[in-house]
Amino acid sequence: MKKLFAALALAAVVAPVWAATQTVTLSVPGMTCASCPITVKHALSKVEGVSKTDVSFDKRQAVVTFDDAKTNVQKLTKATEDAGYPSSLKR
């Protein structure tokens, strides 16, 4: 039992080391006016773990920097979809 507790405690301490900041580009083709990026940026900024967003109307994309221990691409695309702007990972 003590070994199990020690292993769990070690994992809890080391886990944050595995987390990394990631930057992804999302394609957001539904942005049709100059004010759409404001809504998309607001939706993405509310996602826990997002540290930076750069939304471009001209390119119809959002560049998002986030902590992958707190969120993931699926949560980002869900946030834009819930705001009325479906998005997908741009490759």
UniProtKB/Swiss-Prot annotation:
Q: Does the keyword Cytoplasm apply?
A: no
Q: Does the keyword Metal-binding apply?
A: yes
* Superkingdom to which the source organism belongs: Bacteria
Which keywords does this Swiss-Prot/TrEMBL entry list? Mercuric resistance, Mercury, Metal-binding, Periplasm, Plasmid, Signal
- Any one annotated GO CC term: periplasmic space
Leader sequence residues: 1-19
Using the record's annotation, list all stretches that form the HMA domain. Answer: 22-88
Query: One Pfam family this chain carries?
Result: HMA
Tell me, in one coarse class, where this protein mainly resides.
periplasm
Listed binding positions for Hg(2+) are: 33, 36
Alphabetical list of Gene3D superfamilies matching this protein:
3.30.70.100
Task: Please provide, alphabetically and separated by semicolons, the GO molecular function terms listed in this UniProt record.
Answer: mercury ion binding; mercury ion transmembrane transporter activity
Q: Where in the cell is it found?
A: Periplasm
Per the entry, what this protein does is: Involved in mercury resistance. Acts as a mercury scavenger that specifically binds to a mercuric ion in the periplasm and probably passes it to the cytoplasmic mercuric reductase MerA via the mercuric transport protein MerT.
Q: How does it assemble?
A: Monomer.
Q: Which family does the entry's similarity section mention?
A: Belongs to the MerP family.
Q: Which PANTHER family match?
A: P-TYPE CATION-TRANSPORTING ATPASE
What's the protein name?
Mercuric transport protein periplasmic component
